[in-house]
Design a protein with these regions (language model features):
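Beta1-alpha1 glycine-rich phosphate/pyrophosphate-binding loop at the start
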Residues: 35-114, 197-238
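FAD-site-proximal beta/loop scaffold in flavoenzymes
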Residues: 160-185, 280-342, 353
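A Rossmann-like FAD-binding core segment of flavoenzymes
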Residues: 113-122, 130, 137, 215-304
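Glycine-rich, N-terminal phosphate-binding loop of Rossmann-like dinucleotide-binding domains
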Residues: 13, 134, 146-147, 288-289
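Internal hydrophobic alpha-helix adjacent to the cofactor/substrate pocket in enzyme cavities
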Residues: 340-364
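N-terminal secretory signal peptides and thylakoid transit peptides that target proteins
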Residues: 1-17
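Glycine-rich dinucleotide-binding loop and its adjacent helix/turn
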Residues: 33, 147-219
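C-terminal auxiliary extensions adjacent to catalytic cores
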Residues: 44, 383-431
Length: 431
């Protein structure tokens, strides 16, 4: 494809000036997609492009390729490595090393998936083109699994210092947070956490983190305390199990304060402002409200979250686009790694059937299941599971939950087995 020369650029600039804003936008979009290099040769078979190499996206890419070897499957992910957020509180607490959570995409590529380490800049759904930092890709089916962004603006004073306060709910942010915790071991003081109202990624995650950080302080003999400011009236998942652990195990290391909203942050004075007054901190791990990644809004698939067509994972605005993982907003599913993984399997089967010639109306709905283990110390865990069914008459998804709030070593063993099983299915056995 020819490159723009100087004369073409000058002509384009003159046209933009003369035509006005609307015309310039249309022209820019046309040139944006018409001129950049293609990342791959023109496809000779159906192409499935997956944006995001997390729990959901990696699963979709690998499973579609396994089920439809003749299809071209492309996985676009800016990071060269995968890090699991589920089980990451064990790393923060010092129970497990970082390598326990990290995998490469070697086996995914060996399966025949094309791995493109790029960042997605835009998507033209009319022309079925994905624009990345290196060029563009045409697709037949698109899977969006880009994860979440933080709403720093919801807490006045946070956005200006976000680089100083890693949240630890996106992959690899945990490394900086762990370094800060290591320094806190030496100073002690107040380790203030904030938990927002849902929806956010991994509902039990902050409560597990609070317990494991309290375990860390207790085990290391750090003269400090974890102060948990919760916007909710109680833990939003497995409340009896978490509260029992806080009271039984960490009376001197953890203070849990429910019904408390943050109204601002003064980082210079090391104070969190709340409706009940200021709370001083030595180290803060403040979890802001969350939203779907920016690409969702940029391409017109939603605002805070993107909506699907229940009971399927198809975008309500585009039947060539699937939405997987934490970005969806109109289902009762928690934003968990397990839901992303299971829905990734479901989406892969759905796409495979469409590639095989089935119409949408011919494909019966599949709904995910969920299980979530939460550690409360280095050896014990609690869990919750969810099963979902489709009520055709009511046109809605129904949920049924089972909870084990009794912490036990058996649950801990099950948690490790669960994680290892899913990681192996996504990335193959460890070398």
């Amino acid at each position: 494809m020819s490159k723009l020369n100087r004369r073409q650029l000058l002509k384009a600039g003159a046209a933009l000036t003369a035509a006005g804003t609307l015309a310039s936008q249309a022209f820019a979009q046309q040139e944006f997609y018409a001129r950049p290099p293609t990342l791959l040769p023109a496809r000779r078979t159906a192409r499935v492009v997956v944006v995001g190499g997390g729990w959901g996206g990696t699963t979709v890419a690998r499973k579609v390729k396994q089920q439809r070897p003749e299809a071209e499957v492309v996985l676009i992910e800016p990071k060269p490595l995968f890090m699991s957020c589920p089980m990451s509180n064990l790393f923060l607490a010092g129970v497990k090393p970082l390598e326990f959570l990290v995998f490469d995409y070697t086996q995914v590529v060996n399966d025949g998936v094309v791995f493109v380490q790029e960042r997605v800049l835009d998507i033209n759904r009319d022309r079925r083109l994905v624009r990345t930092t290196g060029g563009y890709l045409a697709y037949d089916f698109l899977v969006l699994a880009p994860g979440i962004d933080y709403m720093y603006e919801a807490i006045p004073g946070y956005a200006e210092v976000k680089h100083l306060l890693p949240v630890g709910f996106k992959p690899f942010e945990h490394v900086a947070l762990r370094r800060m915790l290591d320094r806190f071991d030496e100073t002690g003081g107040e380790l203030v956490m904030y938990i927002p109202n849902p929806p956010y990624r991994c509902p039990p995650g902050p409560y597990e983190r609070a317990a494991m950080l309290a375990w860390r302080l207790k085990t290391k003999g750090v003269k400090g305390k974890v102060i948990v400011l919760d916007a909710n009236p109680q833990p939003i998942s497995k409340a009896p199990g978490f509260l029992a652990a806080y009271n039984d195990l960490y009376k001197n290391q953890l203070e849990y304060i429910p019904n408390t909203r943050i109204t601002g942050l003064d980082y210079e004075k090391k104070r969190v402002k709340t409706e009940l007054g200021d709370v001083p901190f030595t180290l803060a791990d403040l979890i802001p409200p969350m939203k779907a990644a920016e690409i969702v809004r940029q391409v017109g698939l939603g605002e805070r979250w993107a909506n699907v067509q229940p009971p399927y994972f198809l975008s309500e605005k585009d039947e060539r686009v699937y939405l997987v993982g934490d970005i969806t907003g109109n289902t009762p599913y928690p934003k968990s790694g397990m839901i992303a993984y299971v829905s990734g399997n479901i989406v892969a089967r759905h796409i495979s059937q469409r590639l095989g010639g089935k119409a949408l109306a011919e494909i019966p709905p599949e709904l995910p299941t969920n299980v979530c283990y939460s550690f409360v110390d280095s050896e014990e865990a609690i869990w919750v599971s969810n099963a979902y069914s489709w009520d055709e008459a009511a046109k809605q998804i129904k949920a049924q939950s089972t909870v084990d709030n009794q912490r036990s070593a058996a649950n801990s063993t099950a948690a490790y087995g669960w994680a290892q099983s899913l990681w192996q299915d996504m990335f193959g056995p460890r070398a």
